[in-house]
């Protein structure tokens, strides 16, 4: 069975966790074998149609593509992500807005795309609830499959990082530079306590002003041993080694679903400091350290506490790519009408 993985955005125009997940899903499925091969979607390639499509997220511009897939007689699977939509009130409001667009404004769009899917995948239980409430997806069509983490992060060594940048301890933050991820607040708090911060990630195209503010803060942090690497890719050994070498990992996002960078840090058994945003209610993050505020003085205190007394974390093996690939294979076979192996 051939499976085509459709990323959220073209790889050449956008970077981020979902693009990484699309690439890694292909690699993991091809490594698994067992009658399934995977490829990334290409707008220009002319080949026989695959047996099934898997859309990793569903931005509006991909809705038309789901219609074409359906017309071609191929099933598709959707991964739905809802980010900060949590709580009964917010879910009901989102469901009402969706109903108005679909039924009063005659703009069914995403609603039809979701209902036409052979299966819906969510990466958290909260997103499974959101899919049911907002889109009316029956629980039997929803499959909970978490993000996968490359097994290299479980056994990483600091040696590559030490050879390139020395063995001084540092705070690590990985992710595309954007306001919702809070890198500026983190850099300013590190500067207040003179803690070296290593930022890994590019500035998103529409976040130039925020990127300039982060650059100014990191210029100050460089006096304390910090640095910013903008072009490190997920498959780079230096990224794995940075996780192994850091004193602890920090991500102060106000909105996420299940951030891959945090899971990579947990796989490396590193202490993690998060801003207590709604997504952190997930049981996966229950044992981590938190800052309750991004107010500079109190946030800096949280940094200092973890720096002085780091507490290691861990990640369960069910988040490894082989395990995720096996679960996806079962979903794909069922969607194509094939009975999975028992």
Please place each PLM-identified region on the residue numbering.
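Nucleotide-activated donor-binding/catalytic signature segment of Leloir-type glycosyltransferases, i.e.
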Residues: 211-234
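Acidic anion/phosphate-binding donor-loop and adjacent secondary structure
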Residues: 132, 148-163, 168
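Membrane-proximal helix-turn-helix segments that form the acceptor-binding/catalytic region
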Residues: 99-120
